[in-house]
Design a protein with these regions (language model features):
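Acidic helix-start/capping segments at beta-turn-to-alpha-helix junctions
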Residues: 79-91, 153-154, 181
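Active-site neighborhood of HAD-like aspartate-dependent phosphohydrolases
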Residues: 73-80, 91-124
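Non-catalytic pre-domain segments flanking phosphatase-related domains
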Residues: 4-9, 13-85, 253-277
Length: 277
């Protein structure tokens, strides 16, 4: 996950620690509003916009259509059916984490806070996710979760606990893969594809589909590559909305979690104004 700018708007958002039994930091008085509010706007959009939710519903509806078609066409001799999905911002969302950062004056992604947030199970199911995943189970389609995280010792158990806390199907060691040392999901996805007929892949980052999209400091090349593969989106790849973080940031900064520096702020500004009239 990545970075965020400060806004007094988030003072109305409840701290994600409520009911978790874990205190991360008190949501102090909201910080002064700054002129730069691009990422704050993205966080507000994620927390309030019906359009944000509609995009999730749309994605899961499309995926379910392909699941139903695959089930109807499957023959006994065929490989079993499966869906491969990312976790974060695909089937689970972290609005409370972003709200916490803003309420505490954070302007960029904060790893220590993220690592404290994860074990609280304060995440939420993405709109439509639970219904879709349960539909897969009802149809006999297995779901494999492939995610990349690193909270140190206990990383895997935390991720598994996140899924189980939300009542997700297939939340077990057979179906969950947590990559700690790499974000390259292709090797694991290929292993799954050897035994299963993978209907669709779901993710919020292009890197969730193929490693070739993980391009640093060249968002134009990444956009071009996406255009070349346009027929895969909505058919084999189901992309979910995420304006606050993802590998698209690495295409600008060279890393997915750039530090809060004057140089990086200047690059944000330069990139945001590149098409100004």
């Amino acid at each position: 996950m990545k970075k965020l700018l400060v806004s007094a708007l988030a003072a109305t958002v409840l701290s994600f620690g409520i009911g978790s039994g874990v205190t991360i930091a008190s949501a102090a008085e909201p910080q002064a509003v700054t002129k730069s509010n691009i990422l704050t706007m993205a966080a507000v959009w994620k927390q309030t916009a019906a359009e944000y939710r509609a995009l999730y519903y749309q994605g899961f509806n499309i995926a379910q259509k392909y699941v139903d078609e695959a089930v109807a066409k499957k023959k006994k001799k065929d490989k079993p059916l499966a869906v491969i999905t990312d976790m974060d911002d695909t089937v689970v969302i972290h609005d409370r984490y972003w709200a916490h950062l803003i309420a505490n004056g954070e302007e960029f992604f904060n790893d220590p806070v993220w690592d404290k947030y994860i074990p609280t199970n304060s995440l939420l199911p993405a709109p439509g996710a639970l219904e879709f995943l349960n539909h897969c189970k009802e149809k006999g389609v297995e779901v494999f979760y492939v995610t990349s995280r690193d909270q140190g010792e206990g990383t895997y158990e935390m991720a598994l606990g996140n899924l189980q806390s939300l009542g997700f199907p297939y939340a077990d060691k057979e179906h969950l893969t947590v990559l700690v040392d790499t974000s390259n999901k292709e090797p694991r996805q290929k292993e799954i594809a050897e035994k299963y007929n993978v209907i669709v892949k779901l993710g919020d980052s292009l890197n969730d589909f193929q490693r070739k999209y993980y391009i640093k400091k060249d968002f134009e090349e990444r956009n071009l590559m996406t255009a070349m593969d346009k027929d895969l989106f909505g058919t084999k790849y189901i992309i979910m909305p995420n304006p606050t973080d993802g590998h698209w940031i690495a295409a600008i900064f060279g890393q997915s979690e750039p530090e809060d520096t004057e140089e990086n702020r200047a690059l944000w500004q330069k990139t945001a104004t590149r098409n100004a009239w």
